[in-house]
Amino acid sequence: MPPKFDPNEVKVVYLRCTGGEVGATSALAPKIGPLGLSPKKVGDDIAKATGDWKGLRITVKLTIQNRQAQIEVVPSASALIIKALKEPPRDRKKQKNIKHSGNITFDEIVNIARQMRHRSLARELSGTIKEILGTAQSVGCNVDGRHPHDIIDDINSGAVECPAS
């Protein structure tokens, strides 16, 4: 038997789920069942909290204390980029491995880099901006009508100025 669960203890559980959908509660059950929470209720709460990320795979952080779950959405860089593209949500089951052939501005890239700054491994914001540009390249979108890697080269050569913070 595992040790008895202390209700005042704060537990943090990370889950990957699709925005706006109630994931399989059977996947939630082994993680949050022992903590005294109903998987169905938590599944519904996650679906509510991730409503504006419809159709995107995102990480959700559950902070559990006193049998209460607080839900926090932790979006990845690619999820933020796809959201900035403002594409209509697509049906995930019909189309697989979608290339997002949109266009976003460099300012939006800088804003995303600021949001991701605390999770970045780069020392400066310019490094984080390059990380986000690399993700934009993987997603398949353009930045200001150009290929993201051309902008990374411009940042390295000094042709494009990055904000300091």
Curated annotation (Swiss-Prot):
Q: Which CDD domains match?
A: Ribosomal_L11 (cd00349)
* Record family assignment: Belongs to the universal ribosomal protein uL11 family.
Question: What's a single GO BP term from this record?
Answer: translation at postsynapse
Q: What interactions and quaternary structure are annotated? A: Component of the large ribosomal subunit. Mature ribosomes consist of a small (40S) and a large (60S) subunit. The 40S subunit contains about 33 different proteins and 1 molecule of RNA (18S). The 60S subunit contains about 49 different proteins and 3 molecules of RNA (28S, 5.8S and 5S).
Transcription regulation as UniProt keyword: no
The root-end lineage is: Eukaryota, Metazoa, Chordata, Craniata, Vertebrata
Mind telling me what this protein is named? Large ribosomal subunit protein uL11
Annotated SUPFAM superfamilies: Ribosomal L11/L12e N-terminal domain (SSF54747), Ribosomal protein L11, C-terminal domain (SSF46906)
Q: What is the species of this protein? A: Mus musculus
Keyword field contains Ubl conjugation = yes
